Amino acid sequence: MASSQQEQQACEIAPASRGNSNRIAALNLDGQSPPCIDDYDQQKPGWRKFLPYVGPGFLVSLAYLDPGNLETDLQAGANHGYELLWVILIGLIFALIIQSLAANLGVSTGRHLAELCKAEYPKYVRWSLWLLAEVAVIAADIPEVIGTAFALNILFHIPVWAGVLMTGLSTLLLLGLQKYGIRKLELLISALVFTMAACFFGELSYVKPPASGVLKGLFIPKLSGQGATGDAIALLGALVMPHNLFLHSALVLSRKVPNSVRGINDACRYFLIESGFALFVAFLINVSIISVSGTVCLAKNLSPENADQCGDLTLKGASFLLKNVLGKSSSTIYAIALLASGQSSTITGTYAGQYIMQGFLDLKMRKWLRNLTTRCIAILPSLFVSIIGGSSGASRLIIIASMILSFELPFALIPLLKFSSSNPKMGPHKNSIYIIVISWTLGFMIIGINVYYLSTGFVGWLTHNNLPKVGNVIIGIIVFPLMAIYILAIIYLTFRKDTAVTYIDPVKNDPNLEANMENGQGKSNQEMAFGRVPYREDLADVPLPE
């Protein structure tokens, strides 16, 4: 009798379905003790239980290897050596924490971040958050546009501005090919990206950076030299992207999760393991790129030709860093991998934009139309800068876009931290006190750096530019109120009390379920044992690698 009660307690009750809450009750209330979903899962080997959850983390991690990351890594290494490696370490640790929180939020609530923002905030606030999220998607697409244009320039000697125009068609072609085998296409793209990573690993073993310098850069925070703060913010912006939080919280909804509290907890743990492995690989790649760039460009015996390239190191000219490994074919292989990096990151950006629009506005667009809209907007500044400033101007635009992403981060991060720590949103799955303290501390540290750089950088520029005094006054009148609005918006999101309830206790909120419990009614053994459904069937068509 006691063992029967223990078995019944082991089968937790899942929340009942309510509107968009996508929870399906699976109550075991028969007189017998049928096998519950967790018992069914325990019959599987551990790796077989883990494999169905593989996919979202790796797809999201492609954003950590996009042209924006490559550009900021290359310039950080060329300008500051190993000094900013600690930014990569902290940034990816923070990325792992918040990406796992985004996954937990989706699994536990059955809704993704954009949908929860719509349910929580007043009309004008959620419209503002939607616009900021769309700006983040566009800012993230700018490095992909420029990186693809550089790759086409290297491969076919097409002018950068013409390559920018051609990027509007390249990704549309890639999206069109998905129907012929998305998993094969993603495998090809990932293979090309990791080929470039392998090249940098090989170059790393050739140039042999000093281990003491690398370790010092990783574990001793330091910001010295001209532009170090700006480069650090650009690194953070390239690593921790706002649209990735919306993307990850939605991608996990395409997975089938057992209808039990334990099943939800296991899913969250599996998504954490998958994200941790994917981000660890991304961490090694980013560290190797900075180390190679720093070692080559700061070498005492650097040739005059390489010294000129290091002085203005861009994505276009970075292939010389791989000559020791690839020889004469370095530029071609580098360009192909750069092209793959830009295209794969753009596909993830397209999905993120779809989820943002669907969540905030209940509006869905076809993938090709969504991509074309975003790409056309991103092409405009890229085209203008590439015509006026050439390759160096386009590279500076990548850094600016990464900084914009860093400044945009609080408007996705703060809602995520609040929702994932909220009992009305998450119920028993909310963050522990340790995660709350760590995540908010790191979040406010990044926000503080952004505000400090925004204020000091603008004031420094305002006092040292060559504009007439009247022009400075007009610019100050426009910019200072915007800075105040930025800070006030962060304060509002931080201290506003959440009101919307998304977690539903099945027994307390459904009198019928409680009555069924009292009457001994419940599902059949077969339904109980195999009661698996996608949390979100409307999102289950997202093409993820198996």
Swiss-Prot record:
What Gene Ontology cellular component terms go with this record? plasma membrane
Which GO molecular function annotation, any one, does this entry have? cadmium ion transmembrane transporter activity
Q: Which InterPro entries match?
A: NRAMP_fam (IPR001046)
**Keyword line:** Glycoprotein, Ion transport, Membrane, Transmembrane, Transmembrane helix, Transport
Extract one GO BP annotation from the record.
manganese ion transport
Q: Where in the cell is it found?
A: Membrane
For this protein, the record's PANTHER family field holds: METAL TRANSPORTER NRAMP5, SOLUTE CARRIER PROTEIN FAMILY 11 MEMBER
In which family does this protein belong, per the annotation?
Belongs to the NRAMP (TC 2.A.55) family.
Q: What is this protein called?
A: Metal transporter Nramp6.2
